[in-house]
Regions:
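Solvent-exposed loop/turn and edge beta-strand elements of beta-rich ligand-binding domains
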Residues: 1-220
Length: 220
């Protein structure tokens, strides 16, 4: 009779250490976020609160597969930065995610597009040398790469940046800083105050034109 060869399967999950600041490095509280697994932001990666941050919830037990299908769990929450601007996401698989800001702190411009985060690990080829309990060491997880693609709408134009995130292979984490810019929200973000200011400016111009026309008529 034959024998089944020994095989070692090592599964890792990863962590994102998020920090929310303004363009002067002031820590921002209560910026709201949701995480998605698709570009259109229709398949939400549900998370629940824990003492250490927000933990990804597996949809398998909810009638779905990975991050699609199934019912929304009652314990799923929207993420928010704390008083120190921190939000931590735990239990992520490798792959691409879309971090969408759903609400910015008062007085700041909300990000219009989701941040595209890609997590790419490299594992050892010496799988049989792994011993249970070794965790993220050079025997198992050799490298961890993470990138962020950010679109910003500034000065009337889009700017796109690709950034290599700082990672820690020993704990499987990546650090990302999300920036909100100071200033009144532009009309594209739905700021009523800006619309009122623009309306007042239009009225002023119309009144000035009417006054000039009246003066011309008197001279004639």
């Amino acid at each position: 009779t034959g024998t089944t060869p020994w095989d070692t399967v090592v599964c890792f999950t990863y962590k994102i250490n998020g920090l929310k600041v303004n363009d002067h490095n002031k820590l921002l509280k209560n910026a709201k976020f949701r995480l998605y697994s698709d570009e259109n932001c229709t398949n939400e990666v549900y998370v629940k609160e824990s003492p250490n941050g927000y933990v990804v919830m597996n949809r398998d037990s909810l009638g779905g597969t990975d991050h699609t299908g199934g019912a929304r769990p009652s314990s799923a929450v929207e993420m928010a930065s704390d008083a120190k601007g921190v939000f931590t996401i735990l239990g992520l698989d490798q792959g691409t995610y879309y971090l969408k800001e759903t609400d910015s702190p008062a007085g700041y411009r909300e990000l219009l597009d989701p941040i595209v985060i890609t997590i790419k690990p490299t594992f050892t080829d010496e799988r049989n040398n792994y011993n249970a309990g070794e965790g993220a060491t050079d025997k198992t997880l050799k490298t961890l790469e993470a990138t962020a693609h950010v679109k910003e709408f500034l000065d009337g134009a889009y700017k796109e940046n690709d950034t290599d995130l700082k990672t820690d292979v020993t704990v499987g984490s990546a650090n990302i800083t999300v920036v909100n810019y100071v200033g009144t929200k532009l009309p594209i973000t739905g700021s009523n105050l800006t619309m009122i200011c623009l309306g007042a400016g239009t009225i002023t111009v119309v009144c000035a034109l009417a006054l000039n026309e009246k003066r011309k008529n008197k001279k004639d």
